């Protein structure tokens, strides 16, 4: 199995690659972790990971700047239904639009917009930086065996914007930051996490292993 982690100039690429290699090794999964900016290699991969940090519009421009990459993603994920994981802004790009400073079109895979977080508790700072628990709304194989909820493991977040999904069924998990904030989305063969699995220690490694085992 070959897992393509897309290098388009954004994301914690080294830590993501190392986390996927470690999760595969510790789970006894035979996987080649391929950090690549080659659209053809993405198109032929068995699983695809889209990381991302920074501004939505910048990440979209970076993705568009890689020849054939958006086309390869749409063909491989939508038409060929290969398993896909978006991380942080990589998850946000699954949306229809980003509303950060300007309106930017996303990939349009998950109905909804990415908008600024406005916590009900004014003492909570933006961005949210640090550890928070997740609450699973819809069971999904990527959360198999992962303790969640008030007594669950913590995930690591760094973000000022959140995906406001139109369909509640697409929201797999939330976190509480002055109100519910989308922590994970998914439908069909695609999932995305607002938190960083590669920085989320046991929760993150378990989620990555589940993604590698997942057969949508």
Curated annotation (Swiss-Prot):
Gene3D superfamilies membership: 3.40.50.880
Record function comment: IGPS catalyzes the conversion of PRFAR and glutamine to IGP, AICAR and glutamate. The HisH subunit catalyzes the hydrolysis of glutamine to glutamate and ammonia as part of the synthesis of IGP and AICAR. The resulting ammonia molecule is channeled to the active site of HisF.
Pathway assigned to this chain's UniProt record: Amino-acid biosynthesis; L-histidine biosynthesis; L-histidine from 5-phospho-alpha-D-ribose 1-diphosphate: step 5/9
Localization per record: Cytoplasm
Alphabetized GO MF terms: glutaminase activity; imidazoleglycerol-phosphate synthase activity; lyase activity
Subunit structure as annotated in this protein's UniProt entry: Heterodimer of HisH and HisF.
Domain Glutamine amidotransferase type-1 intervals: 2-216
Protein name: Imidazole glycerol phosphate synthase subunit HisH
Superkingdom of origin organism: Bacteria
Residues of the active site: 88 (nucleophile), 196, 198
HAMAP family: HisH
PROSITE patterns noted in UniProt: GATASE_TYPE_1
Gene Ontology CC entries for this record: cytoplasm
Main subcellular location of this protein, as a coarse class: cytoplasm
InterPro entries reported in the protein's UniProt record: Class_I_gatase-like (IPR029062), GATASE (IPR017926), Imidazole-glycPsynth_HisH (IPR010139)
Swiss-Prot/TrEMBL catalytic activity: 5-[(5-phospho-1-deoxy-D-ribulos-1-ylimino)methylamino]-1-(5-phospho-beta-D-ribosyl)imidazole-4-carboxamide + L-glutamine = D-erythro-1-(imidazol-4-yl)glycerol 3-phosphate + 5-amino-1-(5-phospho-beta-D-ribosyl)imidazole-4-carboxamide + L-glutamate + H(+); L-glutamine + H2O = L-glutamate + NH4(+)
Keyword annotations: Amino-acid biosynthesis, Cytoplasm, Glutamine amidotransferase, Histidine biosynthesis, Hydrolase, Lyase
Entry's EC annotation: 4.3.2.10, 3.5.1.2
Organism per entry: Brucella suis biovar 1 (strain 1330)
UniProt GO BP: L-histidine biosynthetic process
């Amino acid at each position: 199995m070959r897992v393509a982690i897309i290098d388009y100039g954004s994301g914690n690429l080294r830590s993501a690659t190392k986390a996927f290699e470690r999760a595969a090794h510790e789970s006894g999964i035979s996987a080649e972790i391929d950090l690549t900016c080659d659209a053809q290699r993405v198109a032929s991969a068995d699983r695809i990971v889209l990381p991302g940090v920074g501004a939505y519009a910048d990440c979209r421009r970076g993705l568009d700047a890689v020849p054939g990459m958006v086309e390869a993603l749409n063909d491989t994920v939508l038409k060929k239904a290969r398993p896909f994981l978006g991380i942080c802004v990589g998850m946000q790009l699954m949306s229809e639009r980003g509303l950060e400073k300007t309106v930017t079109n996303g990939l349009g895979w998950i109905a909804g917009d990415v908008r600024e977080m406005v916590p009900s508790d004014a003492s909570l700072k933006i961005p949210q930086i640090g550890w928070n628990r997740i609450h699973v709304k819809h069971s999904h194989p990527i959360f198999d065996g992962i303790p969640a909820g008030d007594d669950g493991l913590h995930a690591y977040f760094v973000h000022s914007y959140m995906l406001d999904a139109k369909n509640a069924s697409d929201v797999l998990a939330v976190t509480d930051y002055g109100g519910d904030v989308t922590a994970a989305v998914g439908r069909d063969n695609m999932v995305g996490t607002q938190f960083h699995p590669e920085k989320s220690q046991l929760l993150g490694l378990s989620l990555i292993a589940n993604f590698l085992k997942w057969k949508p």
